[in-house]
Swiss-Prot record:
Enzyme nomenclature, EC number: 5.3.2.6
GO annotation (BP), single: salicylic acid catabolic process
Gene that encodes it: aphI
Example GO molecular function: isomerase activity
Protein name: 2-hydroxymuconate tautomerase
Source organism (scientific name): Comamonas testosteroni
Length: 63
């Protein structure tokens, strides 16, 4: 059972997350031949103050 964990900065819309889930599922089905019913995708919404880029939080960078 393929299991993908996706970490993204918070703020994406429900539609964007749905698209990520659909496309990651499709990619795993094509890449490893797993039935789509067996693919799991878990999206982690990371608060901007908890995401660091070059030593600075994404919040401080205005991301």
């Amino acid at each position: 059972m393929p299991f993908a964990q996706i970490y993204m900065l918070e703020g994406r819309s429900e539609e964007q997350k749905k698209a990520v889930i659909e496309k990651v599922t499709r990619a795993l089905v094509e890449a490893v031949g797993a039935p789509s019913a067996n693919v799991r995708v878990w999206i982690h919404d990371v608060p901007k103050e908890n995401w660091g880029i070059a030593g600075v939080s994404a919040k401080e960078l205005g991301r």
